[in-house]
């Protein structure tokens, strides 16, 4: 069955049509990424949603596999540069497209940065972007690659697909947060949910929620230090966005039980948010008939694409992608 016939029925299909801006003059991308805009023109009027994305594609080569990158919390499409450049060098028939996630620091609507009204908007954006990539490369296999928060979005979007109608051919989850740490008191999680119901648009900083807690993200950088160097960093987020992330984390193990495509899970042994046992518990819930691969890097941290072990990690990703290419 053609992939275009296998899309799951998000409202996005009825509401959005995909247009490319005049930036498509840069369509044939070489070894350097180009920022191109996607226009989600909504039927029935209203301002269209426009988001940027970056492409790593070997010039003159038609890919037989395309990776779609969904970046993490306070991240950006450029976070995929290290992986994209690795693939350009070692897998010329693999292209990587990474888009700017709604409500994050590169959202063109400034008032929307640090906020999300409904997580279905994230899923709709991913599905619409996937359709754009499929229209451009109709014969290529599609792999979703979510990092951290992006892993939450990709997993839940896939979970919403009807059985037998998966919108991608495989899933890479890099540093997914699959459960809350045991040292996080349940009442704190419940308090955020209640506060988000009462004051959904109130904004708070992460420092206000977790004072004096600066998480190590790579061997060389902690969260505060790393975020301050990013032009796309957001200082404060709405309570409803934080509550949404809490619900997505809480639902990850349920999503695992409904997994319907091959999955690769990447985890750093020094990741602050989850440990090896958490990952193994998540993977154990994936149905027996689904191909699942788990890679644990004992000395790595949360941001694996920036980690000192990234070349080893990228080689493992490349081996897994080649298996999907042969499926």
Residue ranges of each PLM-predicted region?
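Short beta-strand/loop motif that positions the catalytic acidic residue
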Residues: 259, 265-267
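The serine-hydrolase catalytic nucleophile loop
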Residues: 73-85
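Conserved alpha/beta-hydrolase
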Residues: 88-110
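Conserved alpha/beta-hydrolase "acid-adjacent" motif
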Residues: 272-278
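Catalytic nucleophile-loop/oxyanion-hole region of alpha/beta-hydrolase
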Residues: 74-77, 105-133, 137
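Alpha/beta-hydrolase-fold enzymes
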Residues: 149-238
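N-terminal cap/lid segment of alpha/beta-hydrolase-fold proteins
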Residues: 32-58
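Catalytic active-site module of serine/aspartate enzymes centered on a nucleophile-bearing elbow/loop
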Residues: 299-327
């Amino acid at each position: 069955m053609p992939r275009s016939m296998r899309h799951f029925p998000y409202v996005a299909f009825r509401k959005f049509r995909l247009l490319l801006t005049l930036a498509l003059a840069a369509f044939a991308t070489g070894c350097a990424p180009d920022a191109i805009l996607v226009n989600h023109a909504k039927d029935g009027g209203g301002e269209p949603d426009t988001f940027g994305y970056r492409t790593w594609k070997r010039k003159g080569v038609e890919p037989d596999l395309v990776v779609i990158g969904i970046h993490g919390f306070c991240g950006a499409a450029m976070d995929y540069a290290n992986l994209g450049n690795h693939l350009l060098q070692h897998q010329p028939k693999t292209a990587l497209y990474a888009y700017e996630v709604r409500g994050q620091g590169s959202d063109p609507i400034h008032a929307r940065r640090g906020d999300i009204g409904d997580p279905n908007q994230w899923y709709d954006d991913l599905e619409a972007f996937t359709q754009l990539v499929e229209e451009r490369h109709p014969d290529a296999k599609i792999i979703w690659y979510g990092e951290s928060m992006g892993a939450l979005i990709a997993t839940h979007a896939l979970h919403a697909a009807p059985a037998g109608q998966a919108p991608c051919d495989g899933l890479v989850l890099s540093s997914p947060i699959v459960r809350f740490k045991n040292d996080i008191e349940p009442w704190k999680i419940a308090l955020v949910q209640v506060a988000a119901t009462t004051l959904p648009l109130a904004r708070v900083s992460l420092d206000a929620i977790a004072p004096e807690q600066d998480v190590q993200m790579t061997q060389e950088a902690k969260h505060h230090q790393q975020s301050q160097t990013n032009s796309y960093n957001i200082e404060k987020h709405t309570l409803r966005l934080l509550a949404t992330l809490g619900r997505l984390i809480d639902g990850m193990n349920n999503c695992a039980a409904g997994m319907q495509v091959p999955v690769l899970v990447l985890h750093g042994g020094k990741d602050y948010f989850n440990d090896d046992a958490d990952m193994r518990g998540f993977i154990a819930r994936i149905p027996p008939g689904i191909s699942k691969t788990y890679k644990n890097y004992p000395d790595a941290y949360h941001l694996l694409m920036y980690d000192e072990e990234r070349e080893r990690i990228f080689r493992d990703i490349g081996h897994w992608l080649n298996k999907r290419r042969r499926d």
